[in-house]
């Protein structure tokens, strides 16, 4: 880890410690039984014609504020109406302007899978994700030791959450195991935040043939999605391309027309 990612993880440890002081993990565990069964993001992507995972985020470390006043109750239903296969909701507050409340708000408004996108480092965050209504969580190889990543994946499954493992390089291929439901290739280096969509193509041939593959970050051209499909990808996580426009749902709708 280095640069921006190191700063994010250091802050995340501090943040989770504070949250544990406010609400214990035992209190979270008590609320798990009241949560409805999860929707399968893996199945949604495998059976989808579009594979678009539309992302709700207000800002990023590299771009600053994208849509500061964005409200999930307005944007999330528009994503669904446009044809999103699944939703990604950023819940990191300091660096991405999100919160768990965004998932809680969005959950009753849509019937597609929602993934909690955050920097998961502790099982406490898995309980949080389950309670607010997430169906899946992101585990980032660059942010976790391999043993810890597998441990969190197993704990996620125990809670009925699916796991999207995010890798960026061939060095992280050993993180892939039977506990991983989907494999995401991040086209953005989390140390420098430099983006290169060709990263997905470079790694695609080294991944299990039966894996549900997701390309993440830097996708703004419908032609790239067509190329990614040919390379074996079933999911395409896109946020800024939609969120930076006045009507994200309408932008998604036009994007989908262009990739059909």
UniProtKB/Swiss-Prot annotation:
Pathway: Amino-acid biosynthesis; L-tryptophan biosynthesis; L-tryptophan from chorismate: step 4/5
Name of the top EC class for this enzyme: lyase
Record-linked PROSITE patterns: IGPS (PS00614)
Protein name (database record): Indole-3-glycerol phosphate synthase
Keywords per UniProt: Amino-acid biosynthesis, Aromatic amino acid biosynthesis, Decarboxylase, Lyase, Tryptophan biosynthesis
GO BP annotations listed: L-tryptophan biosynthetic process; L-tryptophan metabolic process
E.C. designation(s): 4.1.1.48
UniProt-listed Gene3D superfamilies: Aldolase class I
InterPro entries (alphabetical): Aldolase_TIM (IPR013785), Indole-3-glycerol_P_synth (IPR045186), Indole-3-glycerol_P_synth_dom (IPR013798), Indole-3-GlycerolPSynthase_CS (IPR001468), RibuloseP-bd_barrel (IPR011060)
GO molecular function: indole-3-glycerol-phosphate synthase activity; L-tryptophan decarboxylase activity; phosphoribosylanthranilate isomerase activity
Catalytic activity: 1-(2-carboxyphenylamino)-1-deoxy-D-ribulose 5-phosphate + H(+) = (1S,2R)-1-C-(indol-3-yl)glycerol 3-phosphate + CO2 + H2O
Keyword Electron transport belongs to the record: no
Family listed: Belongs to the TrpC family.
UniProt entry tagged with the keyword Transcription regulation: no
């Amino acid at each position: 880890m280095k640069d921006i990612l190191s700063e994010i993880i250091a802050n995340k440890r501090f943040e989770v410690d504070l949250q544990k002081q406010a609400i214990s993990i035992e209190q979270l565990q008590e609320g798990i039984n009241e949560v409805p069964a999860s929707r399968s993001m893996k199945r949604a992507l495998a059976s989808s014609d579009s594979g678009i995972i539309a992302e709700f985020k207000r800002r990023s470390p590299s771009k600053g504020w994208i849509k500061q006043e964005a409200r999930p109750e307005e944007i999330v239903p528009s994503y669904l109406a446009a044809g999103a296969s699944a939703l990604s909701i950023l819940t990191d507050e300091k660096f991405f302007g999100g919160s768990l409340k965004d998932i809680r708000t969005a959950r009753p408004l849509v019937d597609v899978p929602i993934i909690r996108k955050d920097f998961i480092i502790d099982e406490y965050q898995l309980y949080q994700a389950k309670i607010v209504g997430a169906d899946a969580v992101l585990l980032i190889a660059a942010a976790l030791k391999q043993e810890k990543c597998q441990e969190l994946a197993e704990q996620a499954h125990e809670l009925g959450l699916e796991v999207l493992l995010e890798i960026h390089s061939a060095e992280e291929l050993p993180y892939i195991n039977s506990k991983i439901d989907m494999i995401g290739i991040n086209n953005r280096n989390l140390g420098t935040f430099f983006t290169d969509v060709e990263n997905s193509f470079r790694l695609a041939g080294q991944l299990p043939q039966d894996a549900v593959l997701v390309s993440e970050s830097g996708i703004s051209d419908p032609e790239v999605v067509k190329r990614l499909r040919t390379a074996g990808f079933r999911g395409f996580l896109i946020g800024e391309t939609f969120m930076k426009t006045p009507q994200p749902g309408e932008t998604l709708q036009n994007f989908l027309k262009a990739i059909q």
